[in-house]
A protein has these predicted regions:
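Single conserved hydrophobic/aromatic residue that forms the stacking wall/gate
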Residues: 1-7, 11-12
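Conserved catalytic core of Hanks-type protein kinase domains
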Residues: 4, 22, 121
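Short acidic donor-binding/metal-coordinating loop in glycosyltransferase active sites
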Residues: 8, 32-35
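Active-site nucleotide-sugar/metal-binding loop of Leloir-type enzymes
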Residues: 16-27
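Catalytic-core segments of class I nucleotidyltransferases/pyrophosphorylases
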Residues: 27-29, 36, 42-49, 62-64, ...
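A short, conserved acidic/glycine-rich loop-to-beta-strand motif
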Residues: 51-61
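Extended acidic/charged loop-beta regions that coordinate divalent cations
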Residues: 72
Length: 165
C-alpha cells in the first residue's frame, strides 16, 4: 500500500495526476479522506474486478438532516415527514477503485475530477457504484468532527474494523 499525501490545498485533479507516475498499469484506490466508513475494501475491489469497468465509486444513502415539508400551491403545508432514510439521496462516499485509463479523462488544468471525468465515465458506461449499507459519515464540519471524536473516545467507532474478529 502506498499513500500520497498531497496537501490540503491541492485539488483532486492535481492529486490524481501527481500519483499517475507511481500507478503504472495497476488498478488503484482513491479516497478523499474527509469521511470514515466501515466499507469492506476486499469486497469493493472484488466487485470492481468482476464488472470490468474503469471506475467504481462507493455509494451511500445520505439521510436528510431535517424534516421534509410537502407544500401545496397556496403555500399550505400538506404533509410533514421527519427525516427518513427514504428521503435521502444516494451520494458518492469518496472511496473509489480506478483503472489507470481514468487518467485519460483528466484533460487539463481546469478539469474537476468529480465533474467532467466522472460524468464522461458514466456516459460511456464505465462507472459503477458499489452500494455500501453500513456506517459512513463525512467530516466536513466541526460538528461532524466532534461527533466522530466522541464516538472514537467512547469505544463505539463502527469504522474501527481492524480490531474486529
Amino acid at each position: 500500500i502506498s499513500c500520497s499525501l498531497v496537501g490540503s490545498e491541492m485539488c483532486i485533479r492535481d492529486s490524481i495526476k501527481r500519483v499517475q507516475k507511481y500507478i503504472g498499469n495497476e488498478t488503484f484506490m482513491m479516497t478523499y479522506g474527509d469521511g470514515v466508513c466501515d466499507v469492506n475494501i476486499a469486497e469493493l475491489v472484488k466487485f470492481h474486478k468482476q464488472h470490468g469497468k474503469l471506475a467504481t465509486l462507493t455509494a451511500v444513502v445520505q439521510e436528510q438532516q431535517k424534516g421534509v415539508l410537502d407544500i401545496g400551491q397556496d403555500n399550505s403545508v400538506q404533509a410533514f415527514r421527519e427525516k427518513s432514510v427514504n428521503d435521502g439521496a444516494i451520494i458518492n462516499a469518496g472511496y473509489m477503485v480506478l483503472e489507470p485509463e481514468v487518467f485519460d479523462t483528466i484533460s487539463g488544468d481546469d478539469t474537476i475530477f468529480e465533474q467532467a471525468p466522472l460524468r464522461e465515465l458514466a456516459a460511456k458506461g464505465q462507472l459503477m457504484s458499489y452500494v455500501h449499507r453500513g456506517f459512513w459519515q463525512c467530516m466536513d464540519t466541526e460538528r461532524e468532527k466532534s461527533m466522530l471524536e466522541k464516538m472514537w473516545a467512547s469505544g463505539c467507532a463502527p469504522w474501527e474494523v481492524w480490531n474486529q474478529q
